[in-house]
Amino acid sequence: MNALLTNPFKERLRKGEVQIGLWLSSTTSYMAEIAATSGYDWLLIDGEHAPNTIQDLYHQLQAVAPYASQPVIRPVEGSKSLIKQVLDIGAQTLLIPMVDTADQARQVVSATRYPPYGERGVGASVARAARWGRIENYMAQVNDSLCLLVQVESKTALDNLDEILDVEGIDGVFIGPADLSASLGYPDNAGHPEVQRIIETSIRRIRAAGKAAGFLAVAPDMAQQCLAWGANFVAVGVDTMLYSDALDQRLAMFKSGKNGPRIKGSY
């Protein structure tokens, strides 16, 4: 395989290694590069809740490329046309939100594969992914380097988890705590004991099926708990939340009546 197509993030998942990540919601290549120099194993570049365009995602991929931190792109949804664009700009690992059924999971897999294995549109000669046609036999090699992660974040998805885990081409399943807790009737309360129980059992089911299990935890104790349950790709913070907390803490040192960071929700 061409060295440009190697995917260290996927290789480490296959080995069952734990990888610690950071969520990037700031939408700038400058902030992405700062994060990449910190040494996180992976960086989630968010196109679902952060206002990133395809060009924004592209520039952030360029910014982190020289560093060891591995980029993961989350598009706003899992449509075939959007997945095609994100792959063409050079993303190798995708996190697809709101996957509720095995059929949805199969459609997402198909969108990432070239024919005859899927429906990805052919345009590598004009795309960064193939270095504008300079990677020989790109189409024959790329499937092995792509890593596909799907988010389970609703009661419906939980009911269908075993079927989703059976879909060939899914490398890992990410538990979305904020949407999941809301779907279960505990909005903005991912720490509720029932939600915690479901998160634990889901992580254990994912790992038992031979897939990687992922999670985002903005509280360090929750991140440690998920790691103890077996999650092996865990994001331990969000750049914008860490930035705003740091600003509040610094201001509190010099302004009377300021008590440090305000509560900003579970995500």
Curated annotation (Swiss-Prot):
Active site: H49
Reactions it catalyzes: 2-dehydro-3-deoxy-L-rhamnonate = (S)-lactaldehyde + pyruvate
Binding site for Mg(2+): E153, D179
Gene Ontology MF terms in the entry: 2-keto-3-deoxy-L-rhamnonate aldolase activity; magnesium ion binding
Site (Increases basicity of active site His): D88
Keywords annotated in UniProt: Lyase, Magnesium, Metal-binding
Site-annotated residues for Transition state stabilizer: R74
The name this protein goes by in its record: 2-keto-3-deoxy-L-rhamnonate aldolase
Family affiliation: Belongs to the HpcH/HpaI aldolase family. KDR aldolase subfamily.
An annotated GO cellular component: cytoplasm
Positions contributing to substrate binding: Q151, A178, D179
Stated role: Catalyzes the reversible retro-aldol cleavage of 2-keto-3-deoxy-L-rhamnonate (KDR) to pyruvate and lactaldehyde.
UniProt cofactor note: Binds 1 Mg(2+) ion per subunit.
Known EC number: 4.1.2.53
Cofactor: Mg(2+)
